[in-house]
Every structure is written in structure tokens, then in C-alpha cells.
């Protein structure tokens, strides 16, 4: 490949990345199934010692309708950039986020990853999948 073609390919690649409108992040989030989340919650000795933070990123109104047992906090996904410190997590800690369908929690997971958290998990299907699996909900505490 000639130097000119190589340079043209490089410029085109950078232009495509910049025009895509997406941020390039050094971190990324992962996906976890409701079955794996349920198993992790059942293995935990108690709510406070489960080894990860479980965050509901739905609206307070949705949160009030019931939560996944073991949920630590409700922070609406649109507020995570300014309120993430309330989670109490360090960048190396594991954070699991869920919403109603998985869309908002996917955005939340990427937001947290962009903020430097290295182990962020989005619950696939979120509350819809949790309820479809027949798992119980817990009343919200606040």
C-alpha cells in the first residue's frame, strides 16, 4: 500500500469516527442476564455484602412501583453524570444497573464507564426480563 493510500485510509477512518457522533471511551460496559444477577444475589451473605452495587436508573415513580431485591440506590439515568458519587463506588468496584427494558440502563452503563468505572454491567432486559422470569420484586424503601 502506498503512503498516499495509507494516509487517505487513516484520514477516512478518523473522519468516520468523528462523524459518528459517539464518544470513544477507554472503558466499556458489560451485559449480565437476570439469571446471573439472581444467582449472584442469592450467593451473597446479605444485602450489604454482595460484592457489587445494584442501581435502579428508572424514574422515582417507576422505582416506587417495586425494585429488584438488593437494590442499593435509585438514580435516574439522566442524572448519573452529576450524582454518580452517591453510589459510593470506587472506579475498581462492580456496578450493576437496570431500568425497565434495558435501554436506559445501557446508556447509564456507558455513562458510568465514560466516568472511569471499570466494571459496569447492564442487566439485559432489566425489569421486563426479571418479571418475565417470575422473580419477585421488593417494595421500594423510600
Region spans (language model):
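Rhodanese-like catalytic fold shared by cysteine-dependent sulfurtransferases
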Residues: 2-10, 16-52, 60-94, 103-142
